[in-house]
């Protein structure tokens, strides 16, 4: 019963987060290049990066779940009971979490299908300020694989990018400050191990890595950047290129045109990495030999802007290669499609942000219009306030996601540092002291005597301090009071009194 309560309280919060996708026929967990590599034998193509096995016959006979990329299957643990029975495999459809947008369009008189797909990893899940950095296995928070697909006359092009939290041991716990300072954990050796394992895995999966780090190079973020730069230099992986760009400093005072500095710096390597291109009859013409791995502190707002710019430049190259655009033509000049491109990338930014923070992305006015606007700044302010509230007053419940009237279970969950997302995707790790010094969150279904006594006492002596309604009210009191003060302050300014003194007194009263 206790276990049932934990899951019933946590799973709806996970499932209500947009969006989950599945397909009856397509391998949506794979990029086109990865799918092509698994379907056929291309052992030599990606050396020394990808060590694909030649298993085309085995691949063709497997179900969608069996041949899926397990990093992106969010219902993998739920489908395990079906895996033992071959006749049930057709019902075991892998589900991804992220973003999908399929858009027929016309460019220069040619019909194309432009698709954007993002897949969130299940290997280090959690909410914004509660799950940061990497773990001992090299898995990082908010890791998302984004693929841009272009289909023209039977030919298909694919361009893949990734994002993920800074691969070091660090955290940024909410403390009621608007921007809690990130803090490094562990020693230099642990940071090196986390970075090394993460990057080795990324090189194996995607090829050469260009780490585009957009965090501030001063202050608290600057300490993270300095440590990451030092660790990257120490590890000295020949297949990893580190590219730091202080987004806020370079683009201060709304000088967003200065992003061209970064784009010029990475232009050559983007051309060298190329993209995947497959002809109508199935033969490939090009393969992507590396990816851009972009991050900021959240891997959201700044990351979205840069990824959309890299995607636009790739789209330009693809359309010219497929003879949709002539050499003198630009994607930006295709007015209708350019509007579609900007809006889809902005919608993508919002969705990835909602999944990690609970609000839409910041700076999407630049993605939608190509420039920063005053209305965009106001919208960023509104979303920042919502983020502040959710990070400090709501995400803790989502992270722990247990009934507030079971205090000893709350303690057990906190001790084991597990959340509803980890339980949902099957990532719960048993600690050596679990069940000894503290109760396991995956304890047997039989409730112990403490729980039975607790329920009996609650039924005869309801305690207001332990009721969910009272707990929610207690946590809602501070933000509601703040909102009331702000509302009254706004009203006082909007409806002035006859005397200036009365206005000032009203402002001082409600602001205080």
Language-model region placement:
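Phosphoinositide system proteins, centered on phosphoinositide phosphatases
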Residues: 1-285, 314-512
């Amino acid at each position: 019963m206790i276990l049932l309560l934990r899951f019933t309280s946590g799973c709806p919060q996970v499932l209500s987060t947009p969006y989950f996708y599945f397909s009856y026929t397509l391998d949506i967990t794979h990029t086109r290049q990865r799918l092509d590599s698994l379907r056929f034998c291309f052992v030599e193509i990606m050396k020394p990066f990808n060590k694909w096995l030649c298993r085309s016959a085995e691949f063709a006979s497997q179900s969608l779940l069996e041949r899926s990329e397990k990093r992106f299957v969010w219902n993998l643990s739920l489908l395990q009971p079906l895996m033992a029975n071959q006749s049930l495999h057709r019902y075991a459809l892998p589900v991804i979490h992220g973003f999908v947008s399929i858009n027929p369009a016309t460019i220069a008189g040619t019909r194309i299908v432009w698709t954007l797909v993002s897949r969130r990893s299940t290997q280090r899940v959690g909410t914004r300020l509660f799950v940061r950095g990497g773990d001992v296995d090299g898995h990082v928070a908010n890791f998302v694989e984004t693929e841009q697909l272009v289909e023209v006359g039977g030919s298909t092009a694919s361009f893949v990018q990734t994002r993920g939290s800074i691969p070091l041991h660090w955290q940024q716990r909410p403390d009621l400050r608007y921007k809690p300072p990130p803090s490094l954990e562990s020693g230099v050796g642990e940071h090196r191990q986390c970075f090394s394992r993460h990057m080795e895995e990324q090189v194996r999966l995607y090829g050469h890595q260009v780490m585009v780090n957009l965090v501030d190079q001063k202050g608290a973020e600057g300490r993270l950047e300095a440590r990451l730069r030092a660790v990257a230099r120490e590890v000295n992986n020949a297949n990893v290129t580190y590219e730091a760009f202080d987004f806020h400093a370079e683009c201060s005072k709304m000088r967003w045109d200065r992003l061209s500095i970064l784009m010029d710096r990475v232009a050559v390597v983007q051309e060298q990495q190329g993209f995947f291109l497959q002809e109508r009859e199935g033969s490939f013409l090009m393969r992507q030999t590396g990816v851009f791995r972009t991050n900021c502190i959240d891997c959201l707002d700044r990351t979205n802007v840069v990824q959309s710019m890299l995607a636009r430049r790739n789209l330009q190259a693809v359309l010219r290669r497929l003879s949709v655009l002539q050499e003198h033509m630009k994607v930006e000049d295709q007015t209708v499609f350019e509007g579609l491109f900007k809006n889809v990338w902005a919608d993508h930014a919002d969705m990835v942000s909602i999944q990690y923070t609970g609000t839409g992305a910041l700076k999407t006015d630049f993605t939608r219009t190509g420039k920063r606007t005053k209305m965009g700044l106001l919208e960023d302010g509104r979303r920042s306030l919502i983020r502040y509230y959710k990070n400090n007053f709501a995400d803790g419940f989502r992270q722990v996601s247990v009934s507030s009237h079971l205090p000893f279970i709350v303690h057990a969950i906190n001790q084991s540092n597990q959340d509803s997302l980890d339980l949902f995707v099957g990532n719960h790790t048993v600690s050596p002291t679990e069940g000894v010094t503290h109760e396991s969150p995956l304890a047997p279904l039989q409730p112990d005597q403490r729980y039975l006594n607790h329920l009996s006492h609650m039924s005869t002596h309801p305690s207001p301090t332990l009721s969910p309604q009272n707990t929610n009210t207690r946590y809602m009191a501070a933000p509601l009071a703040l909102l009331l003060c702000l509302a009254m302050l706004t009203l006082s300014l909007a409806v002035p009194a006859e005397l200036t003194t009365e206005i000032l007194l009203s402002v001082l009263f409600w602001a205080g």
